[in-house]
Amino acid sequence: MGISDSHSLSAVRRTVWCAGWPGVVVAVLAACLTLGRGGDATAGVLGPSRPSQVRPPLAIMNIALSDEGSGGLARLRQVPPSPTVFQAQKLLRDLGHYRGVVNGLLDEATSVAVKRYQRRTNLEVDGLISEELVDHLEFTGQAERLVERLSEVRGEQVARARAALAAQPETRNLLVGRAASESANPTRDSAACLAAPNVSCLLEEALEAAKAVHRVHFRDWVLGEILQLQARLGRDDAALETAARIDDPRLVMAALGKIGRAQARRGRWQAAGATARLIPDLRVQAGVLVRLVAALVEAERPAAAYDAARAASALLERIPAARARLDLLSDLVLALEPQSGIEQPLVLRALAQDFAARALAAVEGGEPGVRRRVAVLMARRGRPSAALELAEGLAEIDQRDVLMADIALAQARRGQDRAAAASVAQIILPRYRIAALVRIANLHSAAERRGAARAVLVRALPEIDKIAAKFTYARADAGNRLVHALVDAGEREQAQRTAAAIADARLRADAHWRLAAAAAQAGAPGAAEAERLSLDLTRSIGSALDRAWTSCNGARLGLNAGVQGLAERAFDLALKTVRGIANPWARAQALVRLAATLSAFE
């Protein structure tokens, strides 16, 4: 066979030569090869030399190069290029690992490039080229091209967002991005705030902690969390000031959307409309208007809701992305339909039907994801039959399972319990079946139908064991959901057994806080012990941020149950935990959570 370089020679030398009983050779390989290229090529014959000590039934023989000479075996001097090597060289060059000639010949430079690539990608370093290596190179190349394209798209989006904000005098001052130039005060002492906390000082401490977050993306993230709480509390000026600290102009745009939606939820409709008009991004602006429509419908202001819906609809026509248009159109339909039993005015019903018809018409286009999105819309509108008809065209299990859960809930709302049970039975993945059954049980509990809720939960409990053991978090999450639903249905003993089986420390602690709040609310004899167990489980959580988060959740659960003392003790544990958090990003996140929880006490 022809071999073109020393690398291949070393590969041949590693060949294992096997013989049978002593003196009987069962496999002998001789190979003709050339070393080098062109007129300096050296030709030779490779074969077995001396045998090693034979141990029946096999003998291992070494190999050696013999009959070396130049100019002989001329037919071996022109080795044909390998398509596999050619492709590997091209891919290595594209990835910046190879600068040699792309000729399909495995020379020393190619071998060095292969080894370099193998080292950097944690592959076995042997310098050999195979179909598997070429596949790996192609995958890596595609991934890098995707990253490059995403980077290009991000740059284009940032530039457009910056230009759009700069084009308006009202939003130009939001492009300052002061946080990048601000530095945290190393001598700052937060002890006074944490000793006697209030919402304002906790938010101020969170902003100070954010200054010490050096990675821009994470800093922008936590600033967005701070801003959202400020907006929710009605502190618009402070929220806008925080928005000006955000570096990424796209997130500045999103921040304005958060402010506008918060204003709508608080019933500040004129302010929400004014904020929406400030937002250059049409999707974000339309999202604020959709939230404004929902708030106006709930406030029984049909004329204003109609005008806002028409304004949102006009914006949709200007959004180029079809999927984004459909998502917003679906949200607009649901916003027009009251969720709290308020009778829908005829003018809004007609508008919702018109928008729903437009959504159904989009299915005819056959765009990916449209059928599922419209089916979900029909289910959430309480049209399970239409949703089931659309579901027939869905092939992906996850998409179909989520849709069937929505359909089952819609049927349960209509009192169609058998139909709801049949829809749940069509859900393939057990974690989705549990989620659907829990939602139906919660629906019954909220309507004081606890017997019906218990019957549904009896069906849900065995489903936990059907979730594969490797999905530990999914099993724990399902168990936690069931604990909350069981407590609402009045099944505290079963809830305790379910909570004890939860493997995830954070979710187990959360489940026990729900049990402790329920026990305290009922004045049960074991209420104090239940609270102590919740505190101990929370302290055992490894992550300080998770401990603070879980403690705050416990405080919220206590407040929801009307158990002030438990809520205060849970909050005190969160406060103590935050004092020990040194990481600026985690500290800022925890402080925001503390501020949000404390605001619920007021």
Describe every region a protein language model picked out.
Residues 139-602:
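Non-catalytic tandem-repeat scaffold regions and their flanking low-complexity/translocation tails
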Residues 2-195:
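Cell-envelope/ECM-targeting effectors and their regulatory/trafficking segments
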